[in-house]
């Protein structure tokens, strides 16, 4: 309606007369205003899941299109799903802009090719793309494929081409990617977990048995204390964080935040304590000391459910920053002394009185005794009073009827001690008795919508689906491999569920290779690639730098923006023969060869890399499942057709794969058998359907299956309902054993939508499906005491009813009755949570404070002779690019904003408007010292390069007094680059160092040295 002010008054004055005249039939030809039709009236409603972070918020998408042959469905509205038990209809600013992402002007529509030395793209057909890529791959594979190593062991590996895998893709795409990469012999396979939550698995699995978030989003509401450290949940996971506010508002919970910045999470906290980035282990070890010294532990829990009572070998020691067994030349440990004393039966010796000097309990007490409140204040910069306040509140949850939940994210993982950061906190939860409890646990807040799923599916260099390990070349045959990976119980009468490893592995091989996998050929063991070392991204880009890599696949991954030392990344990509980018959007990686001035100053003519840019679908254009942070597998449905000629990832991979296999069939070559034996028996091999792959992940009975009593449990060809049915005799097949039960003969369990919650605990067992076996809280046997009675009846998860375990969750336990020696941590050989991690961690069985590689102190106050992590892998060329405090005196740390998601949302107009321009944050004191005013343009530099941005001078950052000096922090949001609809900016990772966590090689993005000057 277009009405002037004058017309408006005329209409109002003549309102009665006008309606009367109209009633007599003298109505105007067109009304000035009329009721608008409800815009969703004729729409088709589709349910989906948000593609951004791992809260997994529910979506309702609305599209037009009647399904006619020539009609194209098109989404025109997206909103939150009010039925979803986590999000309850809410979306964060990222989710609110999803429609702009789906319809972004930067969506790719056609396959494109960039020739060597060219400065432009040329459009090509899919056939041209598949044909050329397959020829390049075959030429490289035939030239560099290694069938046997120097010792004559069959290894079937291809090291000169690698692949990055998309954590925004579905689990079904992930499994197709796994089959694609492993059949080719690729070992340089990684996903975003390598640069974000790799330390989560590396720490939680050794401590508890599984490497995943132990509870779930809604369960946070059950906590009495919510501690957010190593993350900023209100900013990065705002809809998930509502459950922390629910705990605060309705359960009288205390919210604690420990962070270098006064964040959005801190703004609603009851207690905020500042900390220097990179010193979390000191803070948390101080908490451990406080709990022990003040006897604020759940003593019965510690005695029965942790390895506190087990005796450690006499030759284990710690002195001056190093544990026993250190080899300074190799920069690694001989870990043989990091183990238990064993009795004549091979079981660990035990002292339940906890008085033996070599029991874990007393060794732990001695180890953390150095971390006094004064030491914490000196190293962390945290005022002693603030630290003690945090300790007191945490200690209150040592009572059986109170719990703390820890929420963490990349603020803990992205350090050279990332895995040990997490382990220290996990040890606190064991002392407090908070593991397995409703409102307790260790909650890893995953960053990408399906990073949990791709980790589950083993898309990492040395992994296989279901947290199985890809064989190494030292495991020359199947027997040696199974012996190396199948643990023996450390204590008598334990579940030791990993003893079923052979069943999981053989079932995987049957799924991979079908009828070709037989007992006579060790189920196709030789066809798997065997590794000699981990080819993580830091390692692989150093190989690129040395000219040892020919090709690289980037599937839904933007390494130019995501990997450390951006200038080195661009230099490395410039040395490739070819690169294939599969993505819905334009990325800096796909255009790394273009000159964008200071932010990417390259000469296209000198870059000889062939680049293929292949347009893929986004979340809204495909069916499939993704796993949120709480391990919930949620099925989503396609809402529209992809733009232009874009195809889904599975179809793209299948196209390349079949062209490559056809070349090998006609021409022969290296490694033919592993490539051709991989099963790809889909109804449409060139376009596998999500439901087919999902059922493959779940698993089938290949013969009639009977239980120990001869009762038929599954007929041949039926889908399995439990991984307990998997066999090691070739009669079952499952691509990912932990997903068994997700799609059964009763249907797709991941599509379940019953949000009823009879217990009030938020477990909603009828919504979606959680691995393992729809269990919502891991280790929930530990929620009850040794007699089977809940520690807190109001938060009962499971209990013993006299004949079996039952309750408000699926029991994470067998049938052992209370009073038996069987421990609650069923994946561990001890059946216990580990305070002492034995030989499972790279730098020690207990956490220890080590400075970041680039330290603002130049020393380590605890042990000056061992400053940084002594087993960190640092390549010579990267070491030359490390800065010193004299030139770069300030701590740099990167982080996210709630309006953006990494570098995706700068392509979405709404998000670009919300946060349009790159900025950095500095304190008022640093601004005054450098003569910088709020809004000034500044240059932030490290030894590796520089960025320019707007300065935001804020009280959210303050200098900390550390070891006799003031330490300032420069806060650096990560969301800008030289592509997108937002204002062009510099890539934050220009500044970050190329060094990683010693266990997972996750880069140290959170603590490095910079300088800042007015531009």
UniProtKB/Swiss-Prot annotation:
Cofactor(s) demanded: Mo-bis(molybdopterin guanine dinucleotide); [4Fe-4S] cluster
GO biological process, one term: heme oxidation
Signal sequence coordinates: 1-33
Gene Ontology CC annotation, any one: outer membrane-bounded periplasmic space
Note describing how the cofactor binds: Binds 1 molybdenum-bis(molybdopterin guanine dinucleotide) (Mo-bis-MGD) cofactor per subunit. Binds 1 [4Fe-4S] cluster per subunit.
Post-translational events: Exported by the Tat system. The position of the signal peptide cleavage has not been experimentally proven.
Record's catalysed reaction(s): a quinone + formate + H(+) = a quinol + CO2
Key words of the record: 4Fe-4S, Iron, Iron-sulfur, Metal-binding, Molybdenum, NAD, Oxidoreductase, Periplasm, Selenocysteine, Signal
Keyword 4Fe-4S: yes
Binding-site residues, Mo-bis(molybdopterin guanine dinucleotide): 196
Keyword Oxidoreductase: yes
Localization per Swiss-Prot or TrEMBL: Periplasm
Ranges of residues in domain 4Fe-4S Mo/W bis-MGD-type: 43-106
Assigned protein family: Belongs to the prokaryotic molybdopterin-containing oxidoreductase family.
Known role: Formate dehydrogenase allows E.coli to use formate as major electron donor during anaerobic respiration, when nitrate is used as electron acceptor. The alpha subunit FdnG contains the formate oxidation site. Electrons are transferred from formate to menaquinone in the gamma subunit (FdnI), through the 4Fe-4S clusters in the beta subunit (FdnH). Formate dehydrogenase-N is part of a system that generates proton motive force, together with the dissimilatory nitrate reductase (Nar).
Name assigned to this protein: Formate dehydrogenase, nitrate-inducible, major subunit
């Amino acid at each position: 309606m277009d009405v002037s002010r004058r017309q408006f008054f005329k209409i109002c004055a003549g309102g009665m007369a006008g309606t009367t005249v109209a009633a007599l039939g003298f109505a105007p030809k067109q009304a000035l205003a009329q009721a608008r039709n409800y815009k969703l009236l004729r729409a088709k409603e589709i349910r989906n899941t948000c593609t951004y972070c791992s809260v997994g918020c529910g979506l309702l998408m609305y599209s037009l299109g009647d399904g006619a042959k020539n009609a194209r469905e098109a989404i025109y509205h997206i909103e939150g799903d009010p039925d979803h038990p986590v999000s309850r209809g809410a979306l964060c600013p990222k989710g609110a802009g999803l429609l702009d992402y789906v319809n972004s002007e930067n969506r790719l529509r056609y396959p494109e090719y960039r020739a060597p030395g060219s400065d432009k793209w040329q459009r090509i057909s899919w056939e041209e793309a598949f044909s050329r890529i397959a020829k390049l791959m075959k030429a490289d594979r035939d030239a560099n494929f290694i069938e046997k190593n120097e010792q004559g062991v069959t290894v079937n590996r291809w090291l000169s081409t690698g692949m990055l895998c998309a954590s925004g893709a579905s689990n079904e795409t992930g499994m197709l990617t796994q089959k694609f990469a492993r059949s080719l012999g690729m070992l340089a396979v990684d996903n975003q977990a390598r640069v974000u939550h790799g330390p989560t698995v590396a720490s939680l699995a050794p401590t508890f048995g599984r490497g995943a978030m132990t509870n779930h989003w809604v369960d946070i509401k059950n906590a009495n204390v919510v501690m957010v450290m190593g993350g900023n949940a209100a900013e990065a996971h705002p809809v998930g964080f509502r459950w922390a506010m629910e705990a605060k508002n309705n359960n009288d919970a205390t919210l604690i935040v420990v962070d270098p910045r006064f964040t959005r999470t801190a703004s609603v906290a009851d207690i905020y304590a500042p900390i220097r980035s990179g010193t979390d282990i000191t803070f948390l070890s101080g908490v451990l000391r406080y709990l022990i010294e003040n006897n604020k532990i759940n003593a019965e829990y510690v005695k029965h459910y942790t390895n506190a009572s087990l005796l450690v070998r006499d030759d284990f020691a710690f002195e001056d920053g190093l544990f026993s067994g250190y080899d300074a030349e190799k920069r690694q440990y001989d870990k043989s002394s990091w183990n238990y004393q064993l009795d004549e039966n091979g079981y660990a010796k035990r002292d339940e009185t906890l008085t033996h000097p070599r029991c874990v309990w007393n060794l732990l007490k001695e180890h953390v005794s150095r971390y006094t409140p004064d030491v914490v204040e000196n190293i962390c910069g945290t005022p002693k009073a603030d630290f003690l306040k945090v300790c007191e509140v945490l200690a209150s949850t040592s009572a059986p009827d109170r719990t703390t939940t820890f929420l963490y994210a990349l603020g803990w993982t992205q350090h050279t001690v990332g895995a040990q950061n997490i382990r220290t906190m996990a040890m606190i939860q064991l002392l407090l008795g908070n593991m397995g409890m409703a409102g307790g646990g260790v909650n890893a807040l995953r960053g990408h919508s399906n990073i949990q799923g791709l980790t589950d599916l083993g898309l990492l260099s040395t992994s296989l689906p279901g947290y199985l390990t890809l064989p190494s070349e030292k495991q020359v045959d199947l027997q040696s491999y199974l012996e190396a990976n199948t643990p023996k119980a450390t204590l008598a009468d334990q579940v030791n569920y990993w003893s079923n490893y052979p069943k999981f592995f053989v079932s995987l091989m049957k799924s991979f290779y079908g009828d070709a996998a037989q007992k006579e050929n060790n189920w196709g063991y030789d066809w798997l690639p065997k590794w000699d070392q981990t080819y993580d991204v830091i390692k692989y880009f150093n190989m690129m730098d040395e000219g040892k890599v020919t090709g690289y696949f980037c599937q839904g991954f933007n390494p130019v923006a995501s990997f450390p030392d951006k200038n080195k990344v661009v230099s490395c990509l410039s040395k490739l023969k070819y690169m294939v980018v599969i993505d819905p959007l334009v990325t800096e990686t796909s255009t790394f060869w273009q000159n964008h001035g200071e932010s990417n100053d390259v000469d296209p003519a000198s870059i000889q890399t062939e680049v293929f840019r292949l347009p893929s679908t986004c979340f809204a254009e495909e069916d499939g499942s993704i796993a949120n942070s709480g391990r919930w597998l949620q099925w989503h449905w396609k809402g529209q057709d992809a733009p232009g000629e874009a195809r889904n990832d599975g179809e793209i991979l299948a196209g390349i794969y079949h062209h490559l296999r056809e070349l090998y069939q006609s021409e022969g070559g290296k490694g033919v058998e592993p490539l051709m034996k991989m099963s790809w028996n889909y109804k449409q091999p060139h376009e596998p359907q999500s439901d087919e792959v999902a059922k493959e992940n779940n698993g089938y009975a290949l013969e009639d299956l009977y239980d120990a009593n001869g009762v038929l449990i599954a007929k041949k060809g039926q889908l399995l309902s439990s991984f307990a049915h998997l066999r090691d005799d070739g009669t079952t097949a499952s691509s990912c054993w932990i997903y068994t039960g997700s799609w059964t003969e009763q249907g797709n369990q991941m599509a379940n939508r019953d949000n009823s919650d009879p217990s009030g605990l938020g477990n909603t067992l009828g919504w979606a499906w959680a691995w393992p076996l729809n269990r919502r809280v891991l280790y929930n046997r530990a929620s009850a005491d040794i007699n089977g009675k809940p520690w807190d009846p109001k938060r009962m998860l499971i209990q013993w009813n006299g004949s079996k375990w039952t309750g408000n969750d699926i029991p994470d336990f067998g049938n052992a009755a209370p009073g038996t020696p069987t421990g609650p941590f069923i994946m561990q050989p001890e059946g216990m949570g580990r305070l002492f991690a034995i030989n499972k961690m790279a730098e020690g069985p207990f956490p220890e404070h080590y400075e970041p590689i680039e330290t603002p102190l130049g020393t380590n106050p605890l042990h000056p002779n061992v400053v940084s992590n002594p087993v960190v892998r640092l390549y010579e060329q990267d070491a030359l690019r490390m800065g010193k405090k004299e030139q770069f005196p300030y701590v740099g740390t990167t982080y996210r904003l709630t309006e953006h998601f990494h570098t995706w949302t700068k392509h979405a107009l709404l998000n670009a408007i919300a946060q349009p321009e790159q900025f950095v944050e500095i304190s008022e004191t640093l601004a005054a010292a450098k003569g910088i005013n709020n809004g000034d343009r500044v240059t932030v530099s490290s030894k590796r390069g520089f960025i320019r941005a707007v300065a935001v001078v804020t009280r959210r950052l303050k200098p900390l007094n550390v070891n006799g000096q003031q330490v300032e922090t420069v806060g650096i949001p990560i969301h800008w680059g030289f592509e997108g609809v937002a204002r062009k900016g510099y890539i934050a990772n220009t500044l970050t160092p190329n060094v990683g966590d010693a266990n997972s090689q996750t880069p140290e993005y959170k603590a490095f040295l910079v300088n800042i000057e007015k531009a």
